[in-house]
Amino acid sequence: MKKSIFLWMGAVMLMLSSCSTNESITDSLSLSKVSHSECNYHASRTRTDDDNPYKSKLKLTYNEADQTITGEYINYMLSCDYTDAGINIEQDADGTLVLNPWNEAENLVDCICNINIYFTIRNATMQNYHLVLNRRTVTIVDQDGSEHQETWTDYEGYISFKNQNIITIDL
């Protein structure tokens, strides 16, 4: 009887140890309260990023009591003819938090503008995150006709709310 109890307890412990903490965190993160401001700072597309006096920033505020991160993507640049904009959240298998802004636009005008995107991440139970902002993968065709993929990001790094509850990242 004791042997079967120990075998049963061993099987349960093995099952519990095979489930990683990241899996439960991955399933629980969610996005809410996504909105955006109106267009500001209109400029011609022919101007360079250096001409834009309003640089993009990501501001994140951690609320431990509510287990939320309130975010603001400041000065997200897009076409003036956009019809909607927002941000998506993903979490990779390794726990990396990925925030990807998006917009719907026809891009038929010679005009760009900046908006602010506001969002809340719910069930943010950890104080440390590997954060990737605006990850996109493109296929590049080389001169010889071969193709390869490259992944670009606006930001990739580690953030910690352990000693501060507000983090601002210059992009």
Predicted segments — roles?
Residues 1-4:
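Positively charged n-region of N-terminal signal peptides that target proteins for export
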Residues 15-18:
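C-terminal motif of bacterial Sec signal peptides marking the signal peptidase cleavage site
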